[in-house]
Amino acid sequence: MRRRCSSPHRQVIEIGRRRLPADSRRKAIARFATGFAVLWLSLTWQISQPRAQIVSSPRELAIIRINVLDLLVHEQSLPLPVKQRRDALWEYYQEFGGELLWLGSRRPNELLARLQNAASDGLDPKDYPSKQLAGLAAAKSTDDKRSLALVELFFSAAFLEYASDIKVGRFLPRKIDPNFFIEGRTIDQTAALKSLAGVDSLDRFFSAWQPSNPRYAALRSALANYLALADKGGWGSVPLGEALKPGMKDPRVPAIRTRLKLSDGVGPSRVEPEIYDDALVDAVKRFQARQGLESDGVIGASTIVAMNVPLQERIQSIIMAMERLRWMPEDLGQQYVIVNIAGFDLRRINGGNVEE
């Protein structure tokens, strides 16, 4: 079972329409920072010395790798994120003769960028020790090989944490809802490290590593669009009123058009601005189908209410959908069924094709 931590502050984040303690990583990060502080005090002094050199030569890297193995075998006070992954780290660095992944490469900056932009993966950047890692990245110029070995292990531990969250989810399913009968999964951490060693960039690794379900990629793309909309201020509300049918004239039409321009890309009116024209009807039908409503093009109360759902709530729904897909088996087989309970909709997938 994957570890989940608690915090005395009991902060919460909203996942879909549920609320869950947002401290799943906070205590781990705090412990990470405690071990980091001791290392950082040592490294800060050493970086200030004129003899410090940036690690580059194969000989230096080989010496650091020896120190990595020694730490994993003999060090009893390893920081918690490293200690929890000691076996996998040992298996990679010793049994597979693993090369150093972080020192002498550009990967630390790539990992930092990924963690700081975790929102694009539907994850919370505050759940990851970016600031601590940034300090360690700056410490790569020290000539203390044992301290550099700890830097290597810190980055590997942080990478494995994020790789796990993207692959199998950051929360246990039953922590979200006790009625979810899905067992939490774990990743092969050694395999993740070996895969990372075989590619030239973290982006390439994560593109291949994230869930392969096409719906996941579609949700990630939609999330990027909605986050961009949020940065621009989101969308306004549409007033309720009488049902609006195709061809009718109504002062709410411009507001509806503006709303659907943001989410569905509908263009400007080719007739009078207040006329509910064919182009807008098509956009409304697409919107209704996506929301599980009857896609008849009639804008009634249910359609207006759906349009007025706050953007942040839509974003949280996408994030929750991405998390659920991470819980699912990687291979669903050639045939499976998707049920949309809210929309009273069932779809059979056969060989990648949707059968209504």
Predicted regions and their residues:
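N-terminal secretory signal peptides that target proteins for export/translocation
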Residues: 1-28
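Auxiliary tRNA-acceptor-end handling modules of aminoacyl-tRNA synthetases
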Residues: 53-356
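Sec/Tat signal peptide C-region and signal peptidase I cleavage site
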Residues: 46-52
